[in-house]
Amino acid sequence: MHTFTRKVKWPFMFTAIGLTFGIVAVACAQPTASTVEGLFKPSSAFADRTDFSLSSILQKSLINRESFNQYLAMRLAPVLRTFYEDNYDTDIKERLNGFTADTDNAFVSQEQNLRNQFRENYLVHLQTDIFDNTGGNQAAWKLRDVNNKIIDDFISRIFAKNFVEYVQDGVGPLTKPTKSLIENTSNFKNIKLQPKFVNKNAKLKINNDAVYAAIQDKLLDQFITNENPNLVSRVVFTNETPVDGFDNYFNTKVIQSPTPSYQFQVFNKYNQQSGGTKGANGFNLLASNLKSYKNDQSKGIDIPNKFSSDSGGKLLLKASDMFDTFDPSFSAAFIQGYLALQKKSKGADSKEVDSLIKDKSIIENFFVDNNTQAAAAARAASSSSEGTIQLKTASDGGGTTQSTVHKTDLVKIFGDKDVFAGEYKQQIGNTNANQTGGGGSGGGGGTSTGSSTGSSTETTTGNSSKAVVDLIEVKKDSSSQPDYILSRGKDGIHLMAVDGGSHYLTESGRDVAKQKKFLLFRALQTKYGLVDTDTTYDFKLFDEVKKYFDTNRILFLFEALLDLSSDTNNKDNFLSYPQFKKFADSIKSIEKDLKELVQAHYKQAVFNETAVAENKVTLKLAERNQPFIDNERNNQIEQNGLAAKLPYEQDAKTGHYNDLGNYYKDIIDNVDKKGTSTVKTTSSNTGQTKNFSEEVVSKLKDNKKKVEEAAKKHVEALKVFTIPSPLYSQVILVQTKLSFTPESTSLGLNLALNNYLTSTELQNSIKLSYFQEDEAFKKIIDITNLTFSQQSGGTGGTNGNNNLTADNWKIFKETYLLDLFESQAQKSIFGHVGSSDKNSSTKTGIEGVLDTLYSSLNLEERLDSDDVIDYLSYLYTAHWLLKDNLKNYKQSLQSKLSRTSNAFLVWSVDSEKNKNDSQSTLSSTASSTSNTGLIQLRSVVSLAQNQAAGQGGDNNSDITQTEVKNPNFVFGSSVYDWTNSKTPEVNRAADDTSSFFYTKSSSSSTGAAQSSATVLRSLNQASGMTTKTAKNRYGFRGIVTSSTSGSLPEAVSRRLFKQFVNQTEKGVKVGGQMLITTAKSGKATLVLKQQADDAESTTNNAYKGALFSFGSMDNLKNIINGIQTQTEFDALYNHLTSDLNIDVTGVDKNKTLTEQKTSLTSFVDSNFKQSTQSAQRGDTSARSARSATVQIKKTQEDNQNTNYKDVFSRFDGYIGDNKVEEKNYTSYQFLSDGGKYHATFVKQVNLDDVEKIGTDSLKQEDSSKDKRLNLSLEEFLAAIALEALDPNNQTQAINALISGNKKGLVKVGDFRIFSSISAQWVRRF
């Protein structure tokens, strides 16, 4: 090994001798003491925990994809080196010497840069910055650099030539095959990747091409199997501006200035006289000759480019990127055609070629019968959902199968919006016709009309009404499978076909070998120019193979070499050439060592990438639908025009499109066959075929175990040991002597370690160990399976959680998932809130969606992921808040709550209903006169009877206790039902998905609506109403203070903290105008009066709770007395007068601070003295003493303190335009804000409530409610669950977790670990 001083070149020294002497002087200098002392001293162990042993860390390194690729590259390079060392091409052989020279020069340059930068300390930095990361010393650095150069050069040679040829038996590759010869499926077997000039028995440099061609062939196999590439022959007819004007198709008074687009898709009519090959005339010619475009010999389909508005030709659609590259409607339409050839397609309308409409406008093919007798009969027979019809389609056995056709009924969707005109009105029907059950109001944005399940086909406009479809399968005749797809897209109408699909796609599946041969046939055609001029296309097959290969080139190349080595069917590949014996032997040697591990990694990589690709289907289709949903949300549904749903059905539970997933299932099933004789595709417990999303998860889990087992076996076989660290080194280095090339193998292991030890996976393993070592936390959750113990917690001692059950802890899990769900851009990809089959155990409601979200995270298989650490950090924070009799939760609240500002437990949701305009309550009836008394009475009695029957209308049902299954189109439109999965009815205005957060309340003591009026309660009781079970309350926001109210709608926040008492409420006088009396018969009569003494129906709650935060008058006075500055006084004074609207009198701001305080105290004494006496009213005794007849009492006399009598009392109830207690919901008026209506329920809390939290707070008994903020246990835990999401609480909890670890901080012995993770988690040995 040369030292650095010998690297200086003599010419350089002679021309710059002064500089050279300086360098020598620096080289001889010793590093500074401070630099050396600051170095990390490596240990013999990575960390002082069991899972951080040498064997364990090496195994994890070889399981990690990136680390394994680092290792694999160093194992691959020595194999490829043998190809260079004995090569008969001198240029290739000399490349090795060039690589070595280039590496030596690169090292000299790098060394010089470090000298110039760090002077006397450069040797330290050479070791720590360079060598420590690349194997430990100069030799390892150079070996790595040369190895990488070998790999890069070899790969560049693989794809340098196009080797596809027609190989005639007994002749070899033809110079140029004929068109007729290759266009025959029986000759496809002769199309191969083979060099034209090779001689197996001679040692020639041209024989290198045999190596490149053979590897190309194996990489092509990978590409075909893993990407499922299909050529699509296609033409497009782009959207047109109609010559007769858009106003002959769309009502331009409703849709102003329509332009050519998908929504306003128009095509000019066929004109026999005009000629031409574009537009309608071109479609006429194309459709008339469609049967002739399929070549019965080659099975290829070539559509003349002249018909296309663009250049036409063919496109290669691949699994990994087609939904990123193309319009998702186009990609999905291709899959529909792919599946149709396998007899697996569903949902689309079907036409025979001869029935295509050719002599009118192209788009008329997409207007289909909407209400024919056949469709109605099919619906009745199949009990199909609205928006679908059942058609008979032929099957192989001569029988018939039912196929649901999804179509869009625009007549019903647009309701009274007159969207269409002229031609389209004639076809589609009159959208503003007076229909039975049809049509929402124009201002309603197309709300559902009689059905919330989808776009119904049932209208009363007669058989002339047409529905719209987006895709049509086109087949030659009734007995054949569809060869073509006619589909609508953003740019126009596409006619497409899977080129050659009928050759390799059958009912039994995809024949990968035939698919490969067909694509080679097309590649051969383009190579030799054997394509007809009118159907030319651009197809560079091996550019696509190279593009795929580059995504994981080390693993894919290694897998290709192993496949060649084990390919017993091909005796003529390069491995049998005498001149490549050394190369072949090296492949064989490494095959035994690495095959199991490489193939396990290979499958895992493909399964992962395919799962990612399939997820894009759901995401991209959701993005496709989103603009149309937004139009509906924004009351601009007419802007959707002709937009129609696609024919694919989304699984409401999982969010996946299972039918489209069959395309991806063809990939993983074929990959799984590698190395096995059979492939399992059915569920072991049901015997039913699994869909893709289920199967890929199963395969990933099973194969992950194979990767782990193979890595463990491989590490054990290598007998790896640590070696002394070089001078100045800060890392642990390893070595093995048991391998084909021990130097490169040892280097590979060190590179794998270098990558893994700085990875997030390693950091998370350290963090995970803290959770695993916390004994109290382990009693709550099984960290391996992430499941809760049935009895989670101790006895309430130091670490106990008062025996919370697993069900209690699920509240925390669901809260975490709801928070995560809210952050998702496309929430519909996780399914939606719907009803399950009555015989199914599937969860309904938001819980089902959260289950899908949780399953998608696959946490149990990713314990070293950020997702798991985030989840465990949250759960530990909840545990930390609960432990020690909720000491930390109590302290957290005490730091947030203040005596001088109110705090609330808040439930707030939005409503699409303006309840304020349509009240049928006592409060609205009370102002009427006696002349309308009978009408008023009937209205009240009817309302009471509805409530007694549990049938209260939207305006009278507590929407905070109503599950909103689709707030503001989160899961799509129920009118369109874009996903054909019965999207729940939309609650339009509720666009804040926090409405999904809910709590379980205690059992209620009265009926569903819990009316505030005596008569309504009496009627409910007379109707046999019984005590109801606990109901959920939605829109839970936890404890909200003025400083944490940002998550609330602005209007709600302002009402709570700036307008708790508003001007309108201040003007309300106590009293009413009517009284309702019930006789024993149950009949009601109306009695007028001046004042009623029934406080429950007429109490003015304006100031109730205004000063609840202070707790009592004494506390308020003490705070006033304790004020030290004018600023403090002004803050309190402004809070009372501005925020709470209290008319404070007698305070002169021009006087001294002491005088102002005295005046304010006097005002408190004068006005609030009754507060403590009126804080609790005897509601229960009043109700029990009340007779069936409400008696008229004298008007109460006003007194100056009446408004303030409950000022220190707790307010629990609804707050909006007015404030009413919980029992008085029917008189509640929503808070309006910009066209939205907020329903908000609150419970006040103060520091006195917080002080009571402690020993008995987590007991189930209601007697403990006053020790948990007057909440049920479920509500209380939900409040704590939200507090556990607080980043500040999480920081404190994790600090406690770390400081409380009995083993102390994790000791680490490698600088790479120490520097990659926060110092709070680790320390040096």
Curated annotation (Swiss-Prot):
Residue positions of covalent lipid attachment, annotated as N-palmitoyl cysteine: C28
Gly residues composition bias: residue spans: 436-448
Residues where lipid is bound covalently (S-diacylglycerol cysteine): C28
Chief subcellular location: membrane
Keyword terms of this UniProt record: Cell membrane, Lipoprotein, Membrane, Palmitate, Signal
InterPro entries: DUF3713 (IPR022186)
Subcellular localization, as worded in the UniProt entry: Cell membrane
Its membrane topology: Lipid-anchor
Domain of life: Bacteria
Gene Ontology CC, one term: plasma membrane
Low complexity bias locations: 449-464
Region of interest: Disordered: 379-402, 430-464
Signal peptide coordinates: 1-27
Family, as annotated: Belongs to the MG307/MG309/MG338 family.
Protein name: Uncharacterized lipoprotein MG309 homolog
Organism annotation: Mycoplasma pneumoniae (strain ATCC 29342 / M129 / Subtype 1)
Biological classification of the source: Bacteria, Bacillati, Mycoplasmatota, Mycoplasmoidales, Mycoplasmoidaceae
